[in-house]
């Protein structure tokens, strides 16, 4: 009689293979074809679960390389404390996706923004800056405003 743990793991493995094969079909097929040719050399059989794990490994690397950190300039008309709070709020909301360009190291000119490779400006006041997206937020950013920022990222 098969134990329940074995059956549970077996079912999980089948679901995992199906998901990975569907989500990353090109990579899965390339690895499967390569492993089929490798079978002759190593005299070992690789099942779909092994191929799914290798696919996950390659896709994880590919996805992590495609993530580009966006440089954000935060312009705020309030105090230093308010600026720090909004900075922390944005960093928490967009972990690993944004880098805040420090305000004291930059003049708010197009040339200054360009020098620092600013991708997006977030401000609680209306700004007219050419060629760099500006998202105007309220003094305390709402979920709708955070969603708008997320779309730009």
From Swiss-Prot:
Residues that span the membrane, as ranges: none
Keywords: Plasmid, Transcription, Transcription regulation
Top-rank taxon, per record: Bacteria
Family designation: Belongs to the AtxA/AcpA family.
Protein name: Putative trans-acting regulator pXO2-62/BXB0076/GBAA_pXO2_0076
Originating species: Bacillus anthracis
Lineage: Bacteria, Bacillati, Bacillota, Bacilli, Bacillales
């Amino acid at each position: 009689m098969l134990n329940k743990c074995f059956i549970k793991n077996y079912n999980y493995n089948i679901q995992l293979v199906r998901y990975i094969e569907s989500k990353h079909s090109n990579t899965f097929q390339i690895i499967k074809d390569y492993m089929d040719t490798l079978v002759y050399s190593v005299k070992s059989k690789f099942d779909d679960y092994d191929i799914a794990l290798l696919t996950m490994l390659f896709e994880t690397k590919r996805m992590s390389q495609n993530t580009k950190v966006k440089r954000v300039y935060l312009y705020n008309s309030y105090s230093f404390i308010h600026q720090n709070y909004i900075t922390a709020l944005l960093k928490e909301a967009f972990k690993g996706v944004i880098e805040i360009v420090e305000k004291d190291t930059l003049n708010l000119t197009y040339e200054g923004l360009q020098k620092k490779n600013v991708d997006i400006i977030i401000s609680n006041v209306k700004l007219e800056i050419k060629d760099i997206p500006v998202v105007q937020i309220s003094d305390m950013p709402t979920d709708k405003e955070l969603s708008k920022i997320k779309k730009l990222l």
